[in-house]
From Swiss-Prot:
One of its GO terms (cellular component) is nucleoplasm. Fe cation binds at H155, D157, H218. Monomer. Binds 1 Fe(2+) ion per subunit. Gene3D superfamilies: q2cbj1_9rhob like domain. One of its GO terms (biological process) is stress granule assembly. Residues 383-393 have a biased composition (Low complexity). Residues 137-239 form the Fe2OG dioxygenase domain. It catalyses: [ribosomal protein uS12]-L-proline + 2-oxoglutarate + O2 = [ribosomal protein uS12]-(3S)-3-hydroxy-L-proline + succinate + CO2. This is Prolyl 3-hydroxylase OGFOD1.
Length: 545
């Protein structure tokens, strides 16, 4: 475009001359017409193609590598220097942690400007011919810097109009042990990611680009180097949008009403302090104000020790739980659990615990728990806020009256146990719209595990319960904490850190989402202080009124 315009008089002439001196060209081998046609033919036929200057592969989805993209090393050094002088901003949420520059669209630095022209004029024209896609001149390019423990978890890059993603690496000597690889996932019959089948190692002046599609799932693995940064320029070429397949919805997790259970289970398992009427009233008041509470030393010490011993013995059958664009952790197979762990799972599903939780939180989780019609004059109306204390959004609720706390320890649970049939309860609870239900699992958390917020996350009113085991020496900087955020926002409302024998209760509304932050390699420090530890466990349950 500049070549078609007459030179401006005055000081503009040296500037244009300067720009001509800083120019970028990509590999002559790639621009050869014969090679370009061969790559275009392979792209069109969806067949692999390999040449010393360029490699195209279809497994697990279409991607291409040009090992020496820019011709001039002097240009690359100048570009590298300009990039490091930029202001970087920390990017942090459930999906990623790294540093990113401002958009490079309007930067005036000579090397950055020259690269931008190369990518979105010369290379875009070449890529349009190769791919057969009418790529638009839209500029979308930024610089990313990944340092120790930074990562970008599994995602597909799909956004309206994105057709081809690219990454130009400007890293020093690099190998797989340093992490930071571009990992590519294969997919199942539902077009959901399964496992990593290919990893591309960054190297100086390597360009990787791939077709953005419903199956282009990839991640940047955690950077493991404490000395070296992983610097890259990345962006997208835009064009006509592809038609997306119908959204896949996972089968819903079964929910069940409480299990009829003698109230003695509470006295057998739970710290007696939490069965005291006055203390329950105090807890309920705090919970209704904050919508969250952490109850320390929740289980009796001897019971907690039995649970930890069973978990440490290794007799539990663990199964990896995905898909990785939504979650990655291990879940216990309940059919083969040791007896004490089965009993603990039964505790959290028991009628007695439903009633105890009703009295600790003021929620209607049992037909004996007071409803709004039973509201007492002493207590009046109470507010249940959203997940974080101090937020103004929330749902108005009515707490239990003090006179109802005599059932806190489940003293009336047994005599009503026979009425716990789901159908009977449903009839009883029509005015409440549903029978109280729960779902739960026993999870193991290790380095690399996480959960993500995703587009199909169902948001509803619910009480989250977590009981943590094996957290000795666990630090917040390791990750593994549960973070609550408002829908559409990255700012954290509440963080629940794993803590031994602590029961976390959090009430969330329809505008509140949660995730477990990626557990990074700093977590390996735990095993140095506690050799028998390589992560932690939690009993995770959700209760619905």
């Amino acid at each position: 475009m500049n070549g078609k315009r007459p030179a401006d008089p005055g000081p503009a002439r040296p500037m244009k001359k300067g720009k001509k001196q800083v120019s970028a060209e990509f590999s002559d081998a790639v621009t050869e017409e014969i090679l370009r046609k061969q790559v275009a033919e392979a792209w069109s036929c969806r067949t692999p193609f390999s040449h010393e200057a360029i490699a195209l592969d279809m497994d697990p989805f279409l991607h291409c590598v040009i090992p020496n993209f820019i011709q001039s090393q002097d240009f690359l050094e100048g570009l590298h220097k300009e990039l490091l002088s930029l202001d970087f901003h920390e990017k942090y949420n459930d999906l990623y942690k790294f540093q990113q520059s401002d958009d490079l669209k309007n930067r005036k630095e000579p090397h950055i400007s020259a690269l931008r022209k190369l990518m979105f004029e010369d290379f875009r024209a070449w890529l349009s011919k190769v791919s057969g896609i009418d790529l638009e001149p839209t500029i979308d390019m930024s610089c990313a810097k990944y340092e120790f423990t930074d990562a970008l978890l599994c995602h597909d890059d799909e956004l309206e109009g994105r057709r081809i993603a690219f990454i130009l690496y400007l890293v020093p000597s690099w190998d797989r042990d340093l992490g930071g690889t571009l990992d590519l996932y294969d997919t199942d019959e539902h077009l959901q990611p399964k496992q990593i089948v290919k990893s591309l190692i960054p190297s100086w002046n390597k360009l990787v680009f791939f077709e953005v599609s419903p199956v282009s799932f990839h991640q940047v693995s955690e950077v493991l180097s404490e000395e070296t940064s992983r610097l890259s320029i990345s962006g997208w070429f835009y064009g006509p949008s592809l038609t997306r397949p119908p959204t896949y919805f996972e089968p819903p997790i079964p929910r069940n009403p409480h299990i009829p259970q003698d109230h003695e289970i509470l006295y057998e398992w739970i710290n007696p302090a939490y069965l005291e009427m006055d203390y329950q009233m105090q807890i309920q008041e705090e919970f209704e104000e904050r919508s969250e509470i952490l109850l320390k030393e929740f289980l009796k010490p001897e019971k907690f020790a039995e649970v930890c011993e069973a978990l440490e013995k290794g007799d539990v059958e663990w199964k990896s739980h995905g898909p990785p664009n939504k979650r990655f952790y291990e879940k216990a197979e309940e059919n083969n659990l040791p007896d004490v762990l089965k009993e603990c799972m039964g505790l959290f599903r028991s009628e007695a615990l439903f009633l105890l939780l009703s009295n600790l939180t003021g929620l209607k989780l049992h037909f004996l728990a007071p409803s709004e019609d039973d509201e007492t004059e002493e207590k009046g109306e109470g507010e249940t806020a959203s997940a974080a204390a101090g937020t103004e959004e929330g749902t108005s609720r009515r707490p239990s009256g003090p006179e109802n706390n005599q059932v806190a320890a489940g003293s009336h649970s047994q005599e009503n146990g026979e009425q716990a049939d789901p159908e009977a309860q449903e009839e009883e609870a029509k005015k409440e719209s549903s029978v109280p239900m729960c779902q739960g699992e026993l999870r193991r958390w290790k380095t690399g595990h996480y959960t993500l917020v995703h587009d199909n996350t169902k948001t509803e009113f619910a009480l989250d319960l977590f009981l943590y085991c094996g957290c000795e020496g666990w630090e917040p900087e390791y990750g593994g904490f549960t973070s609550y955020i408002a829908k559409g926002e990255d700012e954290e409302l509440l963080i629940v850190n794993p803590e031994n024998n602590s029961l976390a209760l959090v009430y969330r509304d329809r505008e509140t989402l949660r995730f477990v932050k990626h557990i990074n390699h700093r977590s390996l420090e735990q095993s140095k202080a506690f050799p028998s530890r390589s992560g932690f466990w939690d009993f995770a349950f959700i209760y619905y009124e």
